[in-house]
C-alpha cells in the first residue's frame, strides 16, 4: 500500500493490491512531467519517500490516466518501507475527514503502539489542509473533439439486461435504447418475472432477444447472456435505469481515447448515499457496476465469467472488477456515460435480499451478507477484512435510505454498541458462511 495507515481507512481498496500489469496508476514526478501534468511534491512531509507517495496518490485522485500504452513507467509504491509517523498522519489529514484521522489514532493507541510517537505525529501534522480533488481535477481538453476510430468502425455491441418483476421500468429502458445515437447493437434480456409476459417485448424498434429463466439467479442470467452474445463488446445494464441518447457512443469513445479495456459509467442513485464527488471527471475506476459498464467480450474469455457463489448475495460485480484489475486490464471511470439508477423498491435483487450487503433483511441474519466477506478474505486476507468490518459495521445499523445522513451515521455507531451481542452474532454467522464459500 502507499501508506501503512491506509489499511485502517481503506483496507479493501483495489489499488492496495499489485496488478499483473501496472499502467502507472501511481506515477512518479518524471512520469507526470513527461505527460505535461504540473504537480509538485508537498515539502511538508519529512521524508522524500512520503513526498513521492503523496504525489502519486494526488495524481491518481485528480484523474491522472497514462494514455500511452508504451510510455507508462511501473509504479514504485507496491512495497511500503517504514515511513515517519508524522508523515503517515499528514497523509490522513490531507485525504480523510477529522473523524477518520482520530479513528486511526484511537486504533493505534488501543493496539499498544508507541503513544508518544502516535500523539506527536497526530499533532504535528494536523495543520495539513484537506485536499478536495474534485474542485480542480486533471482535464482532457482534447476529448470533446476526439474523432474515435472505434466508434467509426461500428463494432457490434450486446446490451445485457437481467430483469425480475419490473416490466413498467423495462419500458423506459427500451425507450432510452431506441433513442441511442449509436445503432449497431443488440439487446439480450433474461427475464425471471412471474408471470412471464412475452408481449412486453413486442413493438420495439430494437434487435431484442429474450428468454424466460425460471430460477431467480442474477449471475447465472448474466453469464448465459454473455455466452449467447454476438457482440464484440458487452454492455451490462440494469432494468431500473435511465440513460442519455449518447450513452453507448460515450462508452466506446472513452475506451478508444484512453486505450482502455473497460468503461465504467457512473451511476447516480436516487436513494441512499450522496453521489461521490469524483463521479464528475475521468479517473481510474476502483469499482465495477454491472448496471453500467462496457467491456471487451474477450475479457470474459480470458479471466472467466461472473462467480456464481455471489448468487442472491452482493458484490459479484465488485469481485469481477477486482479480478479484471489484477489481470492488468485498464478500467476508466466515465462521467459522460452516466445512468440514473432509480433503485425502485420492488423487483430485482431487492426482492431476494436487502437494500445493500451490510443491512440484513432478518434481524438475526448475517451482517454483512457472507459474499462480501468472501470477497474481502479471498483477495485482501482476513486482517483487511476485519479492519473493514470495524469501519463499516457501526453505520450499517442505520437504514439504507438514511445512508447519506451524517448525524444518523454517528447515532448508528452508538447503537452498534448497545446492540453488540446481536451484531457480534451476525458477524460470526457471516464469517462462518464466507469461510464455507472459500472452501
Each model region followed by its residue ranges:
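Non-catalytic, C-terminal membrane-associated alpha-helical segments of glycosyltransferases
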Residues: 84-148, 378-439
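Acidic donor-binding loop at a coil-to-helix junction in glycosyltransferase catalytic cores
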Residues: 46-54, 312-322, 334
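Short, acidic, metal-binding catalytic loop of nucleotide-sugar glycosyltransferases
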Residues: 175-184
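Active-site donor/metal-binding and catalytic loop motifs
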Residues: 54-57, 62-87, 334-359
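Conserved donor NDP-sugar-binding/catalytic core segment of glycosyltransferases
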Residues: 1, 13, 242-279
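Glycine-rich, basic loop-to-helix element that forms the pyrophosphate-binding segment
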Residues: 213-229
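Short aromatic/hydrophobic "clamp" motif used to bind/position activated sugar donors
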Residues: 234
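N-proximal low-complexity "stem/linker" segments adjacent to membrane-targeting elements
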Residues: 11-14, 64, 74-75, 108-176
